[in-house]
UniProtKB/Swiss-Prot annotation:
It is found in: Peroxisome. This is Saccharopine dehydrogenase [NAD(+), L-lysine-forming]. Pathway: Amino-acid biosynthesis; L-lysine biosynthesis via AAA pathway; L-lysine from L-alpha-aminoadipate (fungal route): step 3/3. GO terms for molecular function: saccharopine dehydrogenase (NAD+, L-lysine-forming) activity; saccharopine dehydrogenase activity. Belongs to the AlaDH/PNT family. Signal peptide: none annotated. It comes from Eremothecium gossypii (strain ATCC 10895 / CBS 109.51 / FGSC 9923 / NRRL Y-1056) (Yeast). CDD domains: SDH. InterPro entries: AASS (IPR051168), AlaDH/PNT_N (IPR007886), AlaDH/PNT_NAD(H)-bd (IPR007698), Lys1 (IPR027281), NAD(P)-bd_dom_sf (IPR036291). Catalyzes the NAD(+)-dependent cleavage of saccharopine to L-lysine and 2-oxoglutarate, the final step in the alpha-aminoadipate (AAA) pathway for lysin biosynthesis. It holds the Pfam family AlaDh_PNT_N. Its EC number is 1.5.1.7. The keyword Metal-binding does not apply.
Length: 372
């Protein structure tokens, strides 16, 4: 079976990451893959970098009319305004297996076009572990914005929200800016914040903890929770008693909410910033059900409508690793590479076979629902 990949240009605003990097393209080409890469005005990688790695650069959006045998590779979901049937095989994060808003329409496009979806979120090894994830950099970037928002509140009035953010050249540039913002807050008399991280033992949580440490917080300031600490079920008063709460869990089944408005709407609440890295905003089982807006880089926070206590904001950006697009892309693509090399045997390779079967199960679920 052939393996011809077509990397489409991302269309989500501020999405500068890529599922394939010039580094991984070079390896794939050396193994006999044919790679097409669309020109992209927002990718952190230049078209010339891909060309030098052996890819053929093609026009933006040309995947729509590409031969059917090409596998279309991307990261984020396709534009909502597109409704035409999907006839290609796609590798991407589709966000349609957990009853997210619009899931029926997304799967319906594949059904009507005869296409196939390999959802990146559900590519798993034999132990059930994801073969590639952006979790570490999602946690790292989320913690950075959480600290920055907390520091902003110490040095600005409640009428001023955290301003727009943009991708950073590298980790050190991000850490330096956030650490400097915290120093300004300390000069104003603020004490170092106490940060509660739920999901602290996972990829995402470890990234969050590492950022906090690099910005000068010590272990006594970082409250690390995981399955053992949340086993009793929420909501948890400890969240309202922290200065910053970072949710890093992977939501795989309904759970009790971690926090609710009853705990937040109190005059003695310390919590100032919630970072919902998981960003299950449209999931009916969102464990942080105190907001309903997915925030973006141009407007990174949304205010929680409390009537008592200090101003409280939520950061719910669903593409946080884009804050460090080059490093996040390189790490993700490197992890994905071994599975990509198995694409010529995708009908028997367990990673791809499981993903195909999962797609078929959800398509059948959609069909059954339509027959009711």
């Amino acid at each position: 079976m052939s393996a011809i990949l077509h990397l489409r240009a991302e269309t989500k605003p501020m999405e500068a990451r890529a599922a394939l990097t010039p580094t991984t393209v070079r390896t794939l080409v050396s193994h006999g893959f044919k790679i097409y890469v669309e020109e992209s005005a927002q990718s952190v990688f230049e078209a010339a970098e891909y060309a030098a790695a052996g890819a053929e650069v093609v026009a933006t959006g040309s995947w729509r009319g590409a031969p059917r045998e090409r596998i279309i590779v991307g990261l984020k979901e396709l534009p909502e305004e597109d409704t035409f049937p999907l006839e290609h095989t796609h590798i991407q994060f589709a966000h349609c297996y957990k009853n997210q808003s619009g899931w029926r329409e997304v799967l319906g496009r594949f059904q009507s076009g005869g296409g196939l979806l390999y959802d990146l979120e559900f590519l798993q090894d034999d132990r059930g572990r994801r073969v590639a994830a952006f979790g570490y950099y999602a946690g790292f970037a989320g913690a950075a914005l959480g600290l920055r928002d907390w520091a902003w509140k110490q040095t600005h009035t409640d009428a001023e929200d955290l301003p727009a953010v943009a991708p950073y050249e590298n980790e050190q540039a991000l850490v330096s800016e956030v650490a400097a913002a915290c120093e300004e807050a300390y000069k104003k008399g603020a004490r170092k914040p106490r940060v509660l991280v739920i999901g602290a033992l996972g990829r995402c949580g470890s990234g969050a903890v590492e950022l906090l440490r690099q910005c000068g917080l010590h272990d006594k300031h970082i409250i690390r929770w995981d399955i053992a600490e949340t086993a009793r079920g929420g909501p948890f008063p400890e969240i309202a008693a922290a200065d910053i709460f970072i949710n890093c869990i992977y939501l795989s089944q309904p759970i009790a909410p971690f926090i609710n408005m009853e705990l937040l709407d109190r005059p003695d609440r310390k919590l100032r910033t919630i970072v919902d890295v998981s960003a299950d905003t449209t999931n009916p089982h969102n464990p942080v059900p105190v907001y309903n807006v997915a925030t973006v880089f141009s407007s990174p926070t949304v205010v929680v409508p409390t009537s008592q206590g200090p101003k409280l904001s939520v950061i719910s950006i669903d593409h946080l690793p884009s804050l460090l697009p080059r490093e996040a892309s390189e790490a993700f693509a490197s992890d994905l590479l071994p599975s990509l090399l198995q694409l010529p045997e995708r009908d028997t390779a367990p990673v791809w076979l499981r993903a195909k079967e999962l797609f078929q199960q959800h398509c059948e679920r959609l069909s059954k629902e339509a027959r009711l």
